[in-house]
Amino acid sequence: MATRGKVARWVRRGSTLLLLMAIGAVLLFSQCEQFGAVPSGPDHQRMTESPNYNPEKDIFVNETPGVIDEMLAHSGFWANPRKNLTNNFLFNPNTPTPNVLLPEVRGQLPSDLRDTSDTVKFTWLGHATVLASINEKTILFDPVFSESAAPVSWVVKRYQPPAISIDELPSIDFIVISHDHYDHLDMKAIKFFRESGTRFLVPLGVASHLEHWGISRDRVIEFDWWQTRDIAGISFTCTPAQHFSGRTATIAMQKTLWSSWALRTEATSVYFSGDSGYAGHFKEIGDRLGPFDLTFIDAGQYNERW
């Protein structure tokens, strides 16, 4: 009985310690600038008018029902805590890690980058970051230049620097964002453009993050799926994706919209997928806006947990 009593006391103490640690973590991270801002006021009102918004749950949803619920069911930590503590992309000791830099071509951007006439010039900078010149305008897709894709610098670290540093970039006319995950929306990169004339094209809700980081709202255009704006001779259409969003794990998931993008001029057309699982929206995008001369499609991020 005495032994059981000691065990019970240790369990209570351990539970209390874990609770205090959890509260401390919440208090710490609630003040983290990296988290951005959850849409409120007029921003939230615009969200509620979207056909992709679920008013009962106050979140955005995918066209395919139950996709996120299925993902969360597979990724539940407590289903197998011993396995899931190490079998994830944050703390998995078996994750293959390159011991040499991957092959790349580094060099100065051409002086005639903007002289595209009826063509598209582009440079892949790593992961989802693409620099493109379309219709004599420079466009940067999902710019990420930080050393890690997380709110803290010691996890999700990149294996090698981007092919071009942020300081080497030419003047950028437009930055196009697909969603607010850290490997696609980089706070430090966004802040780099605070004093520039760059305009931002983002899915619904993401403008709240940018404003929180010092970007004036008159430089940001928010889109719902299938909305189109013609700017500087380029037709920008925000197109669907099958994914999710959030910068605070499960605390504020799906509070901003995720998307892909279709760009078209009189001479050419480009598709940028962002992150997306395979679903019927790919065919619909092709039927409605294709064919495309050039596509940028993220691949390889599949896992049984998502």
Predicted regions and their residues:
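Metallo-beta-lactamase
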Residues: 2-150, 154-157, 162-163, 203-274, ...
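Extracytoplasmic
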Residues: 117, 125-127, 170, 177, ...
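Conserved catalytic scaffold of divalent metal-dependent phosphoesterases
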Residues: 137, 144-148, 223-228, 233-244, ...
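Active-site-proximal loop/helix segments of hydrolase catalytic cores
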Residues: 188, 243-306
